[in-house]
């Protein structure tokens, strides 16, 4: 199965979310492109556990979107919009990666195959 060839650099093989992402990318992209995107997604996920990062993806309308995101609960608590009803991260997978958007102060997601890149110079 092609998915196995994508491999794992940082996380354990039992990470269900990354397994789904690997399969989705292997089924939708050439192997080299899938491996590069997967590597960035895996690194983003690990950074966002306790930090924040900057990344770029292509929106549905074709525009590039710069995003600053996290999944760290302490950072989310400091940045979430207190005037609005709290939203929650949706665990369902449909080819997307969810993150807390630090500029919009709410949960957002993007399709994993639209990731343009991860800014490794901006990792907090």
Label the predicted regions.
Residues 24-44:
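Mixed-charge, Lys/Arg-rich low-complexity intrinsically disordered regions
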Residues 2-24:
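Eukaryotic low-complexity, non-globular regulatory regions
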Residues 70-106:
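Acidic, aromatic-enriched beta-alpha/helix-loop junctions
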Residues 69-70, 111:
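Single-stranded nucleic acid-binding surfaces, predominantly the OB-fold ssDNA-binding core
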Residues 94-124:
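Short, compact, well-ordered microdomains
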Residues 65:
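Short basic/aromatic-enriched segments
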Residues 49-57:
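A short, Trp-centered hydrophobic/proline-enriched beta-strand micro-motif
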